[in-house]
């Protein structure tokens, strides 16, 4: 049996045990994982150093190297995520609602794990930990298929995780990692309906669309983030600058970073020179529409290709718009449904924007960078969903469950 089938079978078998594990047993497993990550910190960082060096040798751009790179702070964040998830309420077994029929038949809707989950992701090794601990806490086993860029990092992390599980009641095979980086395995994996209940792709548009279009296993589509910020004419321009800088530059390689800036034409002459200068101070390449270039002539001309593009880099495209209606129409045309923000002091415009923009997260006077499981209070996240079914936005513990009906009778028969 090849590696993929063998490990898929293992996670399916382990799920029969894990789905009935107690909250105490699951929390103990996650606590052990945190301890092992700390204990194996040196080995993980050494493995990651190899991946980072190889990426730089291949000329990978720095924003993507940043997604790949680990350091002590990021290991600490993984450990903190474990501690956070331990503290979260276990959704499994929750009675969502219940009722009693006139004949005394009792019906309850009870939250249960989804089942073995396949995760296909690219260059972020922290995903290995975040997805694992959320899966375990929600009673789901997990089959991981990371990108070749992070192979050494992921192997070191999974080794620590499996060592931790061996010291607990949770089966070691609750977490399996596919070491073979052959891309043809992705197609095989997303068709393993016999073993997997759900597949979640985390990565760029190419990966996500391939999985969505070819899978026979149900897919939870995590999103490409072509995120916009609209600066309305009533916005506090002094306060708007740090919001835009945060949204674009804090971590430009993430899906919740701002990629486009829309500016109301009535404030464009005043605001554009200020924000362009500030963006450039932070190393951002600024592209702009014709109206933007009339005000700041030395920005790079934006083309039609720019508007739908997720840069994942220190690049932003600016468009001057007539009003909130034109901003909304532009976003409707080019948005990926991830995160969209308006900066305004006008209540009516804020209400209109929130009502008409169709996205997983819509912001008023805040950075798009908050679309994140940790920031929303879910602990870690297994991805950010841009679809409307079965989950939307940051996918936390509750979104990794489904439900079943438990029906209690007294030898009832249907008339």
Curated annotation (Swiss-Prot):
Its EC number is 1.2.1.41. The keyword Coiled coil does not apply. GO terms for cellular component: cytoplasm. NCBIfam families: PRK00197.1 (NF001221), proA (TIGR00407). CDD domains: ALDH_F18-19_ProA-GPR (cd07079). It is found in: Cytoplasm. GO terms for biological process: L-proline biosynthetic process. It catalyses: L-glutamate 5-semialdehyde + phosphate + NADP(+) = L-glutamyl 5-phosphate + NADPH + H(+). HAMAP family: ProA. Pathway: Amino-acid biosynthesis; L-proline biosynthesis; L-glutamate 5-semialdehyde from L-glutamate: step 2/2. The gene is proA. Keywords: Amino-acid biosynthesis, Cytoplasm, NADP, Oxidoreductase, Proline biosynthesis. This is Gamma-glutamyl phosphate reductase. Catalyzes the NADPH-dependent reduction of L-glutamate 5-phosphate into L-glutamate 5-semialdehyde and phosphate. The product spontaneously undergoes cyclization to form 1-pyrroline-5-carboxylate. Belongs to the gamma-glutamyl phosphate reductase family. Its main location: cytoplasm. Disulfide bonds: none annotated. The keyword Oxidoreductase applies. GO terms for molecular function: glutamate-5-semialdehyde dehydrogenase activity; NADP binding.
């Amino acid at each position: 049996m090849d590696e993929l089938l063998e490990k898929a079978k293992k996670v399916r078998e382990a799920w029969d045990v894990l789905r009935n594990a107690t909250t105490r047993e699951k929390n103990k497993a996650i606590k052990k994982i945190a301890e092992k990550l700390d204990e194996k910190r040196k080995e993980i960082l050494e493995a990651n150093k190899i991946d980072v060096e190889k990426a730089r040798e291949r000329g990978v751009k720095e924003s993507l190297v940043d997604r790949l790179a680990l350091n002590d702070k990021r290991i600490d964040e993984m450990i903190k995520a474990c501690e956070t998830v331990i503290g979260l309420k276990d959704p499994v077994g929750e009675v969502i609602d219940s009722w009693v029929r006139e004949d005394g038949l009792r019906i309850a809707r009870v939250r249960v794990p989804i089942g073995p989950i396949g995760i296909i992701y690219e260059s972020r090794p922290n995903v290995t930990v975040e997805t694992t601990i959320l899966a375990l806490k929600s009673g789901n086993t997990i089959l991981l298929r990371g990108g070749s860029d992070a192979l050494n990092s992921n192997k070191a992390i999974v080794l620590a995780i499996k060592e931790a599980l061996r010291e607990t009641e949770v089966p070691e095979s609750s977490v399996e990692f596919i070491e073979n980086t052959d891309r043809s395995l992705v197609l095989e994996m997303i068709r393993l309906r016999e073993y997997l209940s759900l597949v979640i792709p985390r990565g760029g548009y190419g990966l996500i669309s391939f999985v969505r279009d070819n899978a026979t296993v149900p897919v939870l589509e995590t999103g490409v983030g072509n995120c916009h910020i609209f600066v309305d004419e009533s916005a506090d321009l002094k306060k708007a600058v740090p919001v835009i800088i945060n949204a674009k530059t804090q971590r430009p390689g993430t899906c919740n970073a701002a990629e486009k800036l829309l500016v109301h034409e009535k404030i464009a002459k005043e605001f554009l020179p200020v924000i362009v200068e500030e963006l450039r101070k932070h190393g951002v390449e600024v592209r702009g529409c014709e109206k933007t270039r009339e005000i700041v002539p030395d920005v790079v001309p934006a083309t039609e290709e720019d508007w739908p593009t997720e840069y994942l880099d220190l690049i932003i495209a600016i468009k001057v718009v007539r009003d909130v209606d034109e901003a909304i129409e532009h976003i409707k045309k080019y948005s990926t449904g991830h995160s969209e923000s308006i900066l305004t002091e006008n209540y009516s415009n804020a209400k209109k924007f929130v009502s008409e923009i169709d996205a997983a997260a819509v912001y008023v006077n805040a950075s798009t960078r908050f679309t994140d499981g940790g920031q929303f209070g879910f602990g870690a996240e297994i991805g950010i969903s841009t679809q409307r079914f079965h989950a939307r936005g940051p996918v936390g513990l509750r979104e990794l469950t489904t439900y079943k009906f438990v029906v209690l009778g007294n030898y009832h028969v249907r008339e």
